[in-house]
């Protein structure tokens, strides 16, 4: 099982997810990626550009869980969990 850490941005997103009623869904995704960050399904995407090296999983139609895996230290860093489209 991998250790999950959160960026400051992702910590802020936790509050938004809770108020939107998405906390349980995110907890399930976090448990899944802690066991195997590359498990498919549910589907994940490799990101490109500024977020190259990160992965994205759908929370719902609007929000994504964006994370990076550091296998050498058994850690996943969650970058964000709120809107992937800039309309926070």
Explain the meaning of each model-derived region.
Residues 32-57:
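A short, surface-exposed loop/turn module that caps and links secondary-structure elements
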């Amino acid at each position: 099982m991998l250790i999950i850490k959160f960026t400051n941005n992702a910590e802020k997103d936790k509050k938004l997810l809770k108020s939107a009623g998405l906390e349980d869904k995110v907890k399930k995704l976090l448990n899944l990626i802690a066991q195997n960050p590359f498990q498919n399904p549910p589907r994940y995407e490799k990101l490109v550009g500024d977020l190259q090296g990160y992965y994205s999983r759908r929370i719902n139609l609007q929000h994504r869980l964006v994370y990076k895996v550091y296998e050498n230290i058994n850690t996943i860093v969650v970058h964000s969990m709120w809107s992937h489209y800039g309309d926070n």
